Design a protein with these regions (language model features):
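Active-site-adjacent helix/loop patches that line small-molecule binding or acyl-intermediate pockets
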Residues: 67-169, 195
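Active-site SXXK
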Residues: 45-62, 81
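Bacterial peptidoglycan biogenesis and beta-lactam-recognition machinery
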Residues: 29, 58-66, 95-98, 140-145, ...
Length: 303
């Protein structure tokens, strides 16, 4: 799992720590431009796969406005706007928060987190779960078992994942939110999202464009995926737990990253360096390490 060093943490020009992992960059034609580590390694893509899950829902009949479709693809911050959006998806299907089977959580904002009671709407995957439930209602599928791997919805999602990645799911586990989680390669993740962004299928076009048009719904103010999509025209990006990230440009150039220790602190630097290899400026500020409250080093990509 370790892979190769992707980022270094420096202090007074000395490398104090490193983050290793796996990285693959695809050319517009789908060939590999650059790699570090082993992109054929099977990983759990976590929430970086939500656009493919959402595609399966739209294909099965989910019909909601683009802003809410972006929320179905989201790992959101639990702001009032995000929670209201998830509730709107449920309400359109005649459901309420009680139907959600994601875990309880608080908003990510520190002030809100101190005062808010845990709810399912505040959980960062509530948009996805609301979309899943709405898709079940449209198709007359059971809503109480929508997270079971053998449920028609989850079988449809798995089929979409395998079709888009070109791989067979090696193992089905359970994600942090309770939804089925699929094991396949980092390269398969890159190919799946590349296929999404270059697809002529109206389903895929709708999902990708919703995220590009409403990046604030996909993550939240100041967060990596939101700010990079805001700063790079046409970019699609989705990160996931345990330090996974995938990003794709409209012409099909795509990157996928897995940091082996699961720590996200170097993700901005690594993603910025990867985009630079495509000739794209992510407009990201350097991340400093501090000594006595002052910058004494930086977190930088090692490639």
């Amino acid at each position: 799992m370790l892979g190769e060093v992707l980022a270094e943490v420096t202090r007074s020009e000395v490398v104090e720590s490193v983050h290793a992992g796996h990285l693959v960059l695809l050319n517009a034609d789908g060939s590999i431009l650059f790699q570090k580590g082993d992109p054929t390694l099977n990983i759990y893509s976590r929430s970086s796969l939500k656009s493919i899950q959402a595609s399966a829902m739209v294909r099965a009949g989910l019909d909601i406005e683009p802003r809410l479709l972006a929320l179905v693809c989201a790992s959101h911050a639990g702001t009032p706007v995000h929670q209201q959006g998830a509730l709107a998806i449920l309400a359109k299907a005649g459901l309420g928060e009680h139907s959600l089977k994601c875990v309880l959580d608080r908003p990510l904002d520190e002030e809100l987190r101190r005062t808010a009671e845990p709810t399912r709407l505040a959980m960062n995957c509530s948009g996805k779960h609301a979309g899943m439930l709405a898709t079940c209602v449209i198709n007359g599928w059971p809503t109480d078992t929508y997270l079971e791997p053998t449920h028609p919805l989850q079988l449809a999602i798995k089929a979409e994942v395998e079709s888009m990645s070109g791989e067979t799911v090696a193992l089905t586990s359970v994600d942090g939110c309770g939804a089925p989680l699929f094991l396949f390669s980092l390269l398969g993740l890159a190919r799946a999202v590349r296929n999404l962004t270059i697809s002529a299928d109206p389903v895929h076009q709708a999902v990708a464009q919703a995220c590009r048009d409403f990046p604030e719904m996909v993550s939240g103010p100041g967060r990596l995926a939101t700010r990079m999509m805001q700063n790079v025209p046409g970019l699609f990006m989705k990160d996931g737990a345990e330090a996974v990230n995938v990003a794709s440009l409209p012409d099909g150039r795509t990157l996928a990253i897995k940091i082996s220790d699961g720590n996200q602190r170097a993700m901005s630097a690594i993603t910025t360096a990867a985009l630079k290899r495509f000739g794209v400026d992510a407009h990201e500020a350097a991340i400093n390490t501090l000594g006595g409250g002052l910058p004494v080093g930086t977190i930088r990509a090692s490639f």
